[in-house]
């Protein structure tokens, strides 16, 4: 009888242990950092300078990538940025929580047109919201848009827009 009790208890303990291992594995997979997406170059056609300006961007497509953004980045070189890609047009809202570098943000509609540009201050919890429904947001080091001659009304190149649409799928 005692042996039967021990055997039954071992089966129960084994089942509980297996369950806990599965839960731990699931949690570790969920919390694991995804590998960074490959940077890509987008082209912006500037009306004022009549040139095409390349910007090397990190795409932020998933909710986790978008939430992290440029948090805790101390340097963002000119000519680089992060493009936030959404599946549908919407009014977007950004803040600078845990972001030590001043940024400028361009809100871009589904046709690739830059609708508006704003500056954002380090660590600010103030919300920067798009006035229009847009599909993309491009963050760069503060002042870069002005230095490069990029303004509201400029457009992404057709090729850049097609590549962004493809990664949104």
Where are these regions (language model features)?
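C-terminal motif of bacterial Sec signal peptides marking the signal peptidase cleavage site
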Residues: 25-28
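Compact, glycine-rich, soluble single-domain proteins
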Residues: 30-169
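Bacterial N-terminal signal peptides that target proteins for export
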Residues: 3-17
